[in-house]
Amino acid sequence: MKRTYQPHNTPRKRTHGFLVRMKTKNGRKVINARRAKGRKKLSV
């Protein structure tokens, strides 16, 4: 049986990347929340 997680960088970036987050209001909310929390990595 094939495992469910088959990592690839392109789809990863396209769905969870910084630029994608910045596109929508809610995405920006996510980035700001992570900034406020002091996360080292804001996005993928």
UniProtKB/Swiss-Prot annotation:
Family membership: Belongs to the bacterial ribosomal protein bL34 family.
A GO molecular-function descriptor: structural constituent of ribosome
Domain of life: Bacteria
A Pfam family recorded for this sequence: Ribosomal_L34
Key words, A-Z: Ribonucleoprotein, Ribosomal protein
Source organism per UniProt: Helicobacter pylori (strain ATCC 700392 / 26695) (Campylobacter pylori)
GO process terms (BP): translation
Keyword NADP part of the UniProt annotation: no
Descriptive protein name: Large ribosomal subunit protein bL34
Keyword Hydrolase tagged: no
A GO CC annotation given for this chain: ribosome
